[in-house]
């Protein structure tokens, strides 16, 4: 339960504002239904943000099913063999984004573009903006971890 309205998760917290909730959900869903970047890669990036920000609520959330081994070894993405080069490029970009967006180098952007093109890079940046913002709101709202 959060301190705003007693909601237990993001959806129930936003429910009293149906216009906002519906528009946000449409935007959020669009990331999982686009053709430029694999949804499983976006989920890895979203989960990595949850790890970095220590958000149990966002870590427990499942927006896209991913390989259990990847989830288990996400903190070791740079060295674990289960991650592809494309996933590594996106995860490295995600970590820098989380720490200091101004520190994102041309090389990091080019690494993502090498796998996903310009449209994939734009999709990643837009998704990270939403994921990072929602992770920070989960912490601010003090949302609890919810089993799905």
Task: List PLM regions with ranges.
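Hydrophobic alpha-helical segments
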Residues: 1-148
């Amino acid at each position: 339960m959060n301190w705003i309205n007693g909601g237990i998760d993001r959806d129930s917290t936003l429910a009293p504002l149906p216009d906002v909730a519906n528009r946000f959900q449409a935007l959020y869903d669009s990331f999982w239904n686009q053709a430029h970047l694999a949804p499983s890669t976006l989920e890895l990036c979203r989960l990595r943000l949850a790890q970095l920000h220590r958000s149990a609520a966002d870590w427990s959330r499942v927006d896209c099913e991913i390989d259990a081994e990847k989830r288990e070894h996400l903190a070791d993405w740079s060295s674990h063999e289960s991650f592809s080069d494309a996933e590594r490029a996106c995860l490295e970009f995600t970590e820098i984004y989380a720490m200091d967006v101004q520190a994102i180098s041309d090389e990091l952007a080019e690494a993502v573009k090498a796998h996903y093109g310009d449209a994939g890079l734009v999709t990643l940046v837009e998704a990270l903006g939403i994921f990072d913002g929602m992770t920070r709101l989960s912490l601010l709202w003090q949302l609890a971890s919810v089993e799905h």
